[in-house]
């Protein structure tokens, strides 16, 4: 498909303390996308569903609005990048297996390749460099095992190497990171209400990583929840 998009700066983009930029221009994007989807569903046997998808896209972005920490104090700054060319591929797969005694296994894979280069000014030192904090490679994997009203899930997220400033030099290189999470869920009927109890372990492997340089993410942590549907 082909479409154009228009994005006005948000109030925070313009006026957030020490970060906003009242001089920001609106962002405009021209998008081109070609994709394919395959979906197969069965009501019998082990293999119940198979889903495959792939998209190839190109975005021509003018006055792209971006924010990242800059300078010796790593203060957040919001600016326009005059022109950014974005090319990428998204691919995904999902499969559901059904076993006797209400056992179900679901798996999902997602992969993205993205090249987002600054083509504003050929005289800039970062001309045709990848823009900050956009990885070339990223992906995720999810596995969920269900039995009756119980469900156990595992998720893995990977983000490849990036650069934390506009110049793609060794000093600005940022290492890849990955993290694993697990979730246990139990549903209970109570009268007309449905209760859903959840227990999560996030950053299961206790990884030390930064999504943004010098902004460390939490180490292993736990979360418990209860949702009620009436």
Residue spans for each PLM region:
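Residue-level signature of outer-membrane beta-barrel architecture
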Residues: 4, 26, 38-40, 44, ...
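Flexible, solvent-exposed coil segments and beta strand-coil junctions
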Residues: 9-19, 66-76, 118-124, 159-166, ...
